[in-house]
Curated annotation (Swiss-Prot):
Region annotated Disordered, chain positions: 1-26
InterPro entries linked to this entry: F-box-like_dom_sf, F-box_AtFBL13-like, F-box_dom, FBD, FBL13/AtMIF1-like, LRR_dom_sf, LRR_FXL15/At3g58940/PEG3-like
Lineage, top ranks: Eukaryota, Viridiplantae, Streptophyta, Embryophyta, Tracheophyta
Repeat (LRR) residue spans along the chain: 80-106, 155-182, 183-208, 227-257, 277-302, 325-351
Lineage: superkingdom: Eukaryota
Residue ranges constituting the F-box domain according to the UniProt record: 29-75
Protein's name according to its UniProt entry: F-box/FBD/LRR-repeat protein At3g51530
Pfam family, one: F-box
């Protein structure tokens, strides 16, 4: 709902109750001031903090009303010194017994002491969500005070581009959500002690950045953790050896851009429901695919030449599989997954759009092996989708034909393609030929509906 709609929607409330002391025929233009304070605070909480504070000049009633707003958000302006002083003054003037959330985004170099001041004030107001975003800041990383990891009312903490040092366990018993983005850690113990201090942590987002820190072994030990998103796009650090994940309550796992470590080990995630694994390669010792055997839904963007897939692992719970088809020999990973997933119901393959030719180098320049057909297609397979299918290699045609021919319970097969430019009509002719070939495949499923569509 737009802000103007909030104000207009509130007007009838003022016309419903009580007698007015104003003379007949007098119409107040300041109807909103007559609303109950609780409703006014709800309205103010939906507005930018800068605008909320400016309402103090409206009238005597509004003078202190903004000080009770429970959600504050500040973003730095060009004059960083005025900004820092204004934020400090605003927080010191704030009177709400509980501060629901405080968001701070600073893009210019400033005195890092302010971070401690702001956070301390917020935590004494029993803040429940604290966000410090320095992602646009180009100065040296600001240290987040260790003493501030000791507030039990905090439920959500999001830090971006800071330096942390946690030499011993602290206390954040209420923390449920933790985001650590481009954070520098002083030694292995900082991360380990931080996670150990959050016994009720449920959601963790961890994105490492391009920097040097002293972490050698990154251990995530969180018994209550339910969702984990881990990204390490600059993982080729000389100091780092790898990751260990200990999260027995984990329901969702996302791993992206992890490469070149000595190890990546996941322990005992027997409650896992869904996982999304992308761009993982060149790890000496890892058990990523082997640890996902309890998952019901998987999305994989991997090359079987660069990751371990143990042949003895069975995915007995897997019903939905999504695979990207632009990595080297992706079809052999598909064979492994089909042979290992007896209850699979939905198979979705996703290729890169043909106009992104610079992303198609794997198909053109790698000496790829031939496709080894699976032993069978899962009996439960009902839906087969192939998005942006290009059929640039014979093996891809074999995959499509094999599934259509051998999926006994298949109900719908959909092949979608992206549009082709007029100057590439030869490719259009090849696509039409492939469509005719697939349309002529004799399928074992009598009820399968074959669909061809453009994106």
């Amino acid at each position: 709902m737009k802000n103007s709609e909030r104000f207009s929607a509130a007007k009838p409330l003022m016309e419903q109750g009580g007698k007015s002391s104003r003379k007949p025929g007098f119409m107040s233009e300041d109807r909103i001031s007559e609303l109950p304070e609780v409703l006014l605070l709800q309205i103010l909480s939906s507005l930018p903090t800068k605008l909320v504070i400016s309402t103090s000049v409206l009238s005597k009633r509004w003078l202190s009303l903004w000080k009770m707003v429970q959600r504050l958000e500040f973003e730095s302006s060009r004059n960083i010194y005025d900004f820092a002083e204004n934020v400090t003054r605003s927080l010191l003037s704030h009177k709400a017994p509980v501060l629901e959330s405080l968001h701070l985004k600073v893009g210019d170099q400033f005195d890092g002491v302010y971070v401690g001041v702001w956070a301390t004030i917020a935590f004494t107001r029993h803040v429940r969500e604290f966000v410090l975003d320095l992602s646009s800041y180009h100065g040296p990383r600001v240290r987040f005070p260790t003493s501030l990891f000791c507030f039990d009312t905090l439920e959500t903490l999001k830090l971006d581009y800071v330096y942390i040092y946690v030499p011993c366990p602290v206390s954040m018993k209420s923390l449920r959500t933790l985001h650590l983005l481009s954070v520098v850690y002083k030694g292995d113990e900082s991360g380990h002690n931080l996670f150990a201090s959050c016994p009720n942590l449920e959601h963790l987002v961890l994105r490492r950045g391009f920097f040097f820190d002293a972490v050698v072994n990154f251990i995530i030990d969180a018994p209550s953790l339910k969702t984990l998103l881990l990204s390490d796009p600059f993982s080729a650090r000389e100091s780092s050896r790898g990751y260990v994940i200990k999260a027995p309550s984990l329901k969702y796992l996302g791993i992206e851009s992890v490469e070149g470590f000595e190890y990546f080990l996941i322990e005992n995630v027997t409650e896992l429901v869904e996982a999304n694994i992308r761009n993982v390669s060149k790890i000496v010792n890892e058990n990523i695919l082997g640890s996902l055997k309890s998952a019901k839904r998987l999305s994989l963007d991997l090359s079987p030449l660069k990751i371990t897939y143990p042949t003895e692992v069975m995915y007995h719970q897997l019903v939905y599989l999504e695979m990207h088809t632009h990595k080297v020999e992706w079809w052999n990973l598909l064979t492994h997954m089909l042979d290992s997933s007896p209850k699979l119901q939905v198979l979705k393959l996703i290729d890169r759009e043909t106009r992104h030719e610079n992303l198609e180098f794997d198909k053109k320049y790698k000496d790829q092996g031939k496709w080894n057909q699976p032993k069978y297609v899962p009996e439960c397979l009902e839906t087969f989708m192939w998005r942006n299918c290009n059929w640039g290699r014979e093996e891809e045609k074999e995959v499509a034909t094999y599934i259509l021919r051998n999926a006994r319970q298949l109900k719908k097969a959909t092949f979608s393609t992206d549009p082709i430019e007029a100057k590439r009509l030869c490719k259009l002719a090849k696509r039409r030929k492939m469509r005719e070939e697939l349309d002529g495949v004799v399928m074992t499923s009598n009820s399968c509906h074959l669909v061809f569509e453009f994106e």
